[in-house]
Every structure is written in structure tokens, then in C-alpha cells.
UniProtKB/Swiss-Prot annotation:
NCBIfam families assigned to the protein according to its UniProt record, in alphabetical order: rplT_bact
GO biological process: ribosomal large subunit assembly; translation
CDD domains referenced in this protein's UniProt entry, alphabetically: Ribosomal_L20
Functional description taken from the UniProt entry: Binds directly to 23S ribosomal RNA and is necessary for the in vitro assembly process of the 50S ribosomal subunit. It is not involved in the protein synthesizing functions of that subunit.
Organism, scientific name: Shigella flexneri
Gene behind the chain: rplT
Any one GO molecular-function label of the UniProt entry: rRNA binding
GO CC annotation, single: ribonucleoprotein complex
Protein name: Large ribosomal subunit protein bL20
Native organism taxonomy: Bacteria, Pseudomonadati, Pseudomonadota, Gammaproteobacteria, Enterobacterales
Pfam families: Ribosomal_L20 (PF00453)
Length: 118
């Protein structure tokens, strides 16, 4: 059986990993074995955090809506319930944007929600 020389493939694989680890601190960017572990872990963090980002943004939007709603004398849960009853279909992302940048429009939404609850 012919001898298989794998130097070229190994070099390419190492180069690929070290390229991915570029910018990492110390041995993590220079030593293949350490860099490989760092790249694998970074991938795990990235995978996890792509999912967490969606949750975190929703939390942020809810916190902003709640703060603005309470300034207008209504709690977040009652505000959302009022909007549902008034059949206002604005998602939390847009509501949070309105709460931050257009206080007058948000106040009118609060009034609609209060009217629907009454």
C-alpha cells in the first residue's frame, strides 16, 4: 500500500483554525492546540448567544414599554391587555421605539388601551 503524506492537509487545517483564532489573546491565537479549543468554545458561545439575543432584546423592549407605561399611570400587563382589546396590533419592538422617541404617540396609545379596559 502506498504511503499517505498528509502534511499539506494538516497545514491547511491548522491555517484555517489559526485564521479563525486571529485576534485572540496569547497562545489562543498562536498555538494550534489551544487555538482549536478556543475556536470551538467561541462557536458554542456564538450559537448560544444568537438565541439569547432574541430573548434579551424582548426583555429590553418590555422594560422600556413598562417604564413609559408607568409614567402614564398604567402597568405593562394592563397596557398590553388594553391594546389587545382595542385590537391595536403593534409589536413590542415598535412599541418600545415609540416609547423612547415619540412620547406623544405613546400617550395616545395608552389612552386607547385605558379606554378599551374601561
Amino acid at each position: 500500500m502506498a504511503r499517505v503524506k498528509r502534511g499539506v492537509i494538516a497545514r491547511a487545517r491548522h491555517k484555517k483554525i489559526l485564521k479563525q483564532a486571529k485576534g485572540y489573546y496569547g497562545a489562543r491565537s498562536r498555538v494550534y492546540r489551544v487555538a482549536f479549543q478556543a475556536v470551538i468554545k467561541a462557536g458554542q458561545y456564538a450559537y448560544r448567544d444568537r438565541r439569547q439575543r432574541k430573548r434579551q432584546f424582548r426583555q429590553l423592549w418590555i422594560a422600556r414599554i413598562n417604564a413609559a407605561a408607568r409614567q402614564n399611570g398604567i402597568s405593562y400587563s394592563k397596557f398590553i391587555n388594553g391594546l389587545k382589546k382595542a385590537s391595536v396590533e403593534i409589536d413590542r419592538k415598535i412599541l418600545a421605539d415609540i416609547a423612547v422617541f415619540d412620547k406623544v404617540a405613546f400617550t395616545t396609545l395608552v389612552e386607547k388601551a385605558k379606554a378599551a379596559l374601561a
